[in-house]
Amino acid sequence: LRSLDMDYKTMQQLIENISESEKQLLEYTSSKDPYKIRGAVPMEEARLLAPIPYPQQDVICLGINYMDHAAESARYKKEAFTGERPFAVYFSKRVNRAVNPGEGILSHSDIVTDLDYEAEMAVIIGKEASRVPADQVKDYIFGYTVINDVSARTIQNRHKQWYFGKSMDGFLPMGPCIATVDELEFPPK
């Protein structure tokens, strides 16, 4: 970004402050051969970092977000599964620092006996939002990244809730990149 005279110190600053003309410049530049861009570094020499290493707020998640998982959850709880979920299941993850791509995670083996993980698509909200009408949702999304939702099932089962078992240090590997909202079909599938 510095080679394009954009002096954002973090991706969070870019998300909050990027102008339309800067977006156009990035779009134009990204269509070029990356090794012809001043200051470009070959991928094999780069160290990839989490796109948003220090999220400003808890990460809000949508649980049991596909049919197979809903059926699995119902079996685990010994409930009948009708194929319908009238209401979404939300939970949050406290994240002090996202884990970089390829970096190991802490096992917390002193209190955790079984780690679980699920690859998830993360939606990055680009501006303040509350009670956004469905037809305007896309306008509030900056982009998407990949996260690994790591869980300590031992802790979740013992405490009968998800927060602590999903929020231990190192339980949010993220990245390696962000796809802007316009790069994917909306809504993404």
Task: Describe each region flagged by the PLM.
Residues 52, 56-189:
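Glycine-enriched loop-and-adjacent helix/strand subsegments that border the catalytic/binding cleft
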Residues 1-84, 88:
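N-terminal non-catalytic cap/leader segment that marks the start of a structured domain
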